[in-house]
Amino acid sequence: MTIKLHDLKPARGSKTPRTRVGRGEGSKGKTAGRGTKGTKARKNVPVTFEGGQMPIHMRLPKLKGFRNRFRTEYEIVNVGDINRLFPQGGSVGVDELVAKGAVRRNSLVKVLGDGKLTVKVEVSAHKFSGSAREKITAAGGSVTEL
């Protein structure tokens, strides 16, 4: 026998109707399963209520400061990274750094001066630190800001 889509039925007992409580004196009537008297019988206790203990949102410190929405974020590449990724020297731009996996696509690049540079490179990036600019020119290379 093949089962057809229109013959499918839920398993017996898996679909039970919602119990309507507090409707008359029958089962689940009157106190509606809440017991007698007390806060829990009369109304809901807030989820955040901790029984008189100082609540967690008041125990934790407030966050200080703010996050500037207009800040420009740069991907950082050090001079030592350029030396390691381009041992033969040459022209180094954002596209070459993306191809080598040093930075992500469509990101602004800032070159910092950590590490040593032993090869002549022509670097083009969005920003340069002073020490990076000095090290690149000292190695015989050139710096171009985009």
UniProtKB/Swiss-Prot annotation:
Belongs to the universal ribosomal protein uL15 family. One of its GO terms (biological process) is translation. InterPro entries: Ribosomal_uL15, Ribosomal_uL15/eL18, Ribosomal_uL15/eL18_sf, Ribosomal_uL15_bac-type, Ribosomal_uL15_CS. GO terms for cellular component: cytosolic large ribosomal subunit. The lineage of its organism: Bacteria, Bacillati, Actinomycetota, Actinomycetes, Mycobacteriales. GO terms for molecular function: rRNA binding; structural constituent of ribosome. Pfam families: Ribosomal_L27A. PANTHER family: 50S RIBOSOMAL PROTEIN L15 (PTHR12934), LARGE RIBOSOMAL SUBUNIT PROTEIN UL15M (PTHR12934:SF11). Residues 1-52 are annotated as: Disordered. Keywords: Ribonucleoprotein, Ribosomal protein, RNA-binding, rRNA-binding. Binds to the 23S rRNA. Residues 1-10 have a biased composition (Basic and acidic residues). This is Large ribosomal subunit protein uL15. PROSITE patterns: RIBOSOMAL_L15 (PS00475). Part of the 50S ribosomal subunit. NCBIfam families: rplO_bact.
